[in-house]
UniProtKB/Swiss-Prot annotation:
GO terms for biological process: selenium compound metabolic process. Glycans are attached at residue 109. Might be responsible for some of the extracellular antioxidant defense properties of selenium or might be involved in the transport of selenium. Keywords: Glycoprotein, Secreted, Selenium, Selenocysteine, Signal. Residues 191-241, 309-367 are annotated as: Disordered. This is Selenoprotein Pa. It is found in: Secreted. Pfam families: SelP_C (PF04593), SelP_N (PF04592). Residues 1-19 form the signal peptide. It comes from Danio rerio. Residues 221-237 have a biased composition (Basic residues). The keyword Cell wall biogenesis/degradation does not apply.
């Protein structure tokens, strides 16, 4: 019996003993065929490094990811990595199809596919989940299948995966790869690695020490993404929020890995509009305000809050026109950050909502 158990354990270690063995087995292989109508996106992209993001239009985090994907495209082109095909495949569930335009508005030079419901699910075909990003070489072979938290585009993992695929022939030689493309890659690498002339600086022992610490940290971070597909335990946060002035019920905020690194992004810093109060002279209470459209990806360390949510410790003032939704505990979900209620001497100034010019998505309502 122990002999059989040992053999089973050994086999588990060999194949990974997890759902990730399917992803590993797909590496350097052509993807299963999937279509959107009569279009075969992967065949059309042959000859280019291809990046496919699986996003959901009803997910606020996904919309932010879509915007950052545009930024990544421009960044890589400026660094000398052209001719990369980027595409996004929307989820086929009803809410995502209905809000397809929200995703489209955030993708400038990137093709967005709305699935044909009469055809097989394109996500299932490649074993993709929401927020996954897959990278393919010029011959259409899978080089990276990245999942949260490694697909957060403010982190370097996706960018590095694209660069490695572009330059390193991860799956061997490719007949669709030209010498000119490899020369482009060489130039881009040389440009990135070009030494930067340092300005003269005073020598301080503790500064030297700090520099080495940061260098070591960067080195650890650079090597930390070679196995980005482990940790697929997800937590789905579902709340009612206002997206583009359309109230959605039970919007899925995305999968958050249990071991996700915490990122502290204060709500006030990322607020998009504020309610202003004018106080009579002599008022000794602080001015109250409510900040809308908080863009906090994760809560404070160890608090277990769901991605995409912003919480307050005080109840929202009744006079605040922010579109936050209260729970019974008076916490505000996603769109608002609270301040203490305004003193009696304060009145709402006009206009009550200060939004960026031309911003139709501002969540404040005018009285």
């Amino acid at each position: 019996m122990w002999k059989a158990l040992s053999l089973t354990l050994a086999l588990c270690l060999l194949v990974g003993c997890s759902a990730e063995s399917e992803t590993e087995g797909a590496r350097c292989k052509l993807p299963p065929e999937w279509k959107v109508g009569d279009v075969e996106p992967m065949k059309n992209a042959l000859g280019q490094v291809t990046v496919v993001a699986y996003l959901q239009a009803s997910u606020l985090f996904c919309l932010e990811q879509a915007s950052k994907l545009n930024d990544l495209l421009l960044k890589l082109e400026n660094q000398g990595y052209p001719n990369i095909a980027y595409m996004v495949v929307n989820n086929r569930e009803e809410r995502s199809q209905r809000l397809h335009h929200l995703l489209q508005e955030r993708l400038l030079n990137i093709t967005l596919y709305a699935q044909d419901l009469s055809q097989p699910d394109a996500w299932q075909a490649v074993n993709a989940e929401k927020d996954d990003i897959l990278v393919y070489d010029r011959c259409g072979r899978l080089t990276y299948h990245l999942s949260l938290p490694y697909t957060i585009l403010s982190h370097p993992h996706v960018e590095e995966a694209i660069k490695h695929t572009y330059c390193d022939r991860i799956c061997g030689e490719c007949s669709l790869e030209s010498s000119a493309q490899l020369e482009e890659c060489k130039k881009a690498t040389e440009e990135v690695n070009k030494p930067v002339e340092e300005e003269p600086r005073q020598d301080h022992g503790h500064h030297e020490h700090g520099h080495h610490e940061h260098q070591g940290e960067a080195e650890r971070h650079r090597h930390g993404h070679h196995h980005p597909h482990h940790h697929h335990h997800h937590h789905r946060g579902q709340q009612q929020v206002d997206v583009d002035q359309q109230v959605l019920s039970q919007v899925d905020f995305g999968q958050v890995a249990v071991e996700t690194p915490m990122m502290k992004r204060p709500u006030a810093k990322h607020s998009r509009u504020k309610v202003q109060y004018s106080u009579q002279q002599g008022a000794d209470s602080p001015v109250a305000s409510u900040c809308u459209h908080u863009r906090q990806l994760f809560g404070g360390e160890g608090n277990g809050r769901v991605a995409g949510l912003u919480h307050c410790d005080e109840p929202l003032p009744a006079s605040u026109p922010u579109q936050g939704l209260k729970e019974q505990d008076n916490h505000i979900k996603e769109t608002u950050q609270u301040r203490p209620a305004p003193p009696a001497e304060u009145e709402l100034s006009q206009p009550t909502u200060v939004u960026p010019a031309g911003d139709a998505t501002u969540g404040u309502r005018k009285k």
